[in-house]
Amino acid sequence: MTNIRKTHPLMKIVNNAFIDLPAPSNISSWWNFGSLLGICLILQILTGLFLAMHYTADTTTAFSSVTHICRDVNYGWIIRYMHANGASMFFICLFMHVGRGLYYGSYAFMETWNIGVILLFATMATAFMGYVLPWGQMSFWGATVITNLLSAIPYIGTNLVEWIWGGFSVDKATLTRFFAFHFIFPFIIAALAMVHLLFLHKTGSNNPTGISSDTDKIPFHPYYTIKDILGARLLILALMLLVLFSPDLLGDPDNYTPANPLNTPPHIKPEWYFLFAYAILRSIPNKLGGVLALVLSILILILMPLLHTSKQWSMMFRPISQCLFWILVADLLTLTWTGGQPVEHPYIIIGQLASIMYFLLILVLMPMASTTENNLLKW
């Protein structure tokens, strides 16, 4: 008799995606981050659901409702900090996942890659709106500064900003709609993740060599399920160490001050995972130019398949490209650090140089290095 998991309409889908899925035999731990992102998303939805039960999306009570969650709700403090630090873990996994895709040429699967970029944008939008909800000083001023960037769009900019605000400033209407969107977006992300997986399973996974692994596949279960469980345990360990020992390490002290439209904080900055993009935005003195550079810094990922000039997809056997890739990583870390510093000398010039380097590496140096490697290999 055939096993029920292979015949039942619903179990068959699960079976083909997580049990009998043919996977390359040589994929490394860099391929763990997809499942870790799934775990992060589930964790964020669950903790967020419990937070939403006690949170009130009103300017007069939002801040005190978060305080109430931490002080009066049973284990409210751990739920709140798991949600806040869970977002940081989510972005660490996201950046690793995207970095793996760039290094090993996973952008060859264009549908999967493009949906991945849309997922990145959706996650960034969700995290931004979530940061506004506690209604602290940094929440309010972060929302004011970032939404105001849309006013740089010619003709419709000002109207667009006021439409998003629901008034003439960030106020009750803004907070209510941000809460509504912050609640619905993770479910949209989950649906997009399903489509992401659907396209991935059409082509099969990439592997470190970048060569087709059709001749050498192994079942996903038990080999990669056990590997993913190890990754999940390490992720939860890291998250709980952060939550239980240093929950405010990645937060901003200004967000423990209730929002005050009459008092601007000395240094407005977003959460650490947006600092690289914020540094690029700040590097350009022109408002519209800065906004375009900010959007392009992420949107440039969609161009990766078009910028690929090498005859090999993976960087595994391409030392020059490897070197440039790690310079790019160092450049992004520099941008992240600069974005968190005040707008003064020498941080302005460091940010500008790092921003130029970022676009130069992706658009010019890496394609040139790939062509050079082709010539060295006489291809």
UniProtKB/Swiss-Prot annotation:
Residues binding heme b b566: H97, H196
Pfam families cross-referenced by the UniProt entry: Cytochrom_B_C, Cytochrome_B
Cofactor: heme b
InterPro entries assigned: Cyt_b/b6_C, Cyt_b/b6_C_sf, Cyt_b/b6_N, Cytb/b6-like_sf, Cytochrome_b, Cytochrome_b_C_euk/bac, Cytochrome_b_N_euk/bac, Di-haem_cyt_TM
A Gene Ontology molecular function term of the record: metal ion binding
Lipid bilayer topology: Multi-pass membrane protein
Localization, UniProt: Mitochondrion inner membrane
Predominant localisation class: mitochondrion
Residues that hold heme b b562 according to the record: H83, H182
GO cellular component: mitochondrial inner membrane; respiratory chain complex III
Transmembrane region(s): 33-53, 77-98, 113-133, 178-198, 226-246, 288-308, 320-340, 347-367
PROSITE patterns, per the entry: CYTB_CTER (PS51003), CYTB_NTER (PS51002)
SUPFAM superfamilies assigned to the protein according to its UniProt record, in alphabetical order: a domain/subunit of cytochrome bc1 complex (Ubiquinol-cytochrome c reductase), Transmembrane di-heme cytochromes
Entry note: cofactor: Binds 2 heme b groups non-covalently.
Amino-acid positions noted as binding a ubiquinone in the UniProt annotation, renumbered to this chain: H201
Annotated function: Component of the ubiquinol-cytochrome c reductase complex (complex III or cytochrome b-c1 complex) that is part of the mitochondrial respiratory chain. The b-c1 complex mediates electron transfer from ubiquinol to cytochrome c. Contributes to the generation of a proton gradient across the mitochondrial membrane that is then used for ATP synthesis.
Assembly, per entry: The cytochrome bc1 complex contains 11 subunits: 3 respiratory subunits (MT-CYB, CYC1 and UQCRFS1), 2 core proteins (UQCRC1 and UQCRC2) and 6 low-molecular weight proteins (UQCRH/QCR6, UQCRB/QCR7, UQCRQ/QCR8, UQCR10/QCR9, UQCR11/QCR10 and a cleavage product of UQCRFS1). This cytochrome bc1 complex then forms a dimer.
Misc. remarks from the entry: Heme 1 (or BL or b562) is low-potential and absorbs at about 562 nm, and heme 2 (or BH or b566) is high-potential and absorbs at about 566 nm.
Family: Belongs to the cytochrome b family.
Name of this chain's protein: Cytochrome b
Gene: MT-CYB
